[in-house]
Amino acid sequence: MPKAPKGKSAGREKKVIHPYSRKAAQITREAHKQEKKEKLKNEKALRLNLVGEKLQWFQNHLDPQKKRYSKKDACELIERYLNRFSSELEQIELHNSIRDRQGRRHCSRETVIKQTMERERQQFEGYGLEIPDILNASNLKTFREWDFDLKKLPNIKMRKICANDAIPKTCKRKTIITVDQDLGELELNDESSDSDEEMTAVA
């Protein structure tokens, strides 16, 4: 009887890869590379979603009558943004204050909110909080027309606004001059007191 034809894979056993071989190391590197790629992809998607939520809030709270915002107006809008969780925190505190409740409910959510508010407040009072460029009329118009598509985020111009931007430049200059004058007066007073002491010692 004729022998049954053997397939190409017939008789071939899958080789077992030694854990310390170069092939195993290559597979491990590829797996780590893929994991890192997926992690970066997820982090990027998360950042885009967070930016998208922020921009959506600002767009929903724009004054339809304004063609552009002043720095003072922008700072006032940012203050509203920084306090956007206030009502939710009040509700959480209310639930936690009710008797016969064991432990604090929504503790993790409360912690996340407070950390977010603290971080954004530090940015605003420090080097600045990044928001859509609503100070420029053309950029504001583009931002108003945004349809919440995250792929169109590069079309939206951003800029950093800090708390000091709400203070007019003239007020800042006056404050600096006043401080300089005070320092000058202190130096003069110190010099006069030193000369008085010297005269007393000579006498």
UniProtKB/Swiss-Prot annotation:
One of its GO terms (molecular function) is preribosome binding. Residues 29-39 have a biased composition (Basic and acidic residues). InterPro entries: Tma16, Tma16_sf. GO terms for biological process: ribosomal large subunit biogenesis. Keywords: ADP-ribosylation, Nucleus, Ribosome biogenesis. The modification ADP-ribosylserine is found at S9. The keyword Secreted does not apply. Residues 1-39 are annotated as: Disordered. One of its GO terms (cellular component) is nucleolus. It holds the Pfam family Tma16. It is found in: Nucleus. It comes from the Eukaryota. Involved in the biogenesis of the 60S ribosomal subunit in the nucleus. Associates with pre-60S ribosomal particles. PANTHER family: TRANSLATION MACHINERY-ASSOCIATED PROTEIN 16. Belongs to the TMA16 family. This is Translation machinery-associated protein 16. It comes from Homo sapiens (Human). The gene is TMA16.
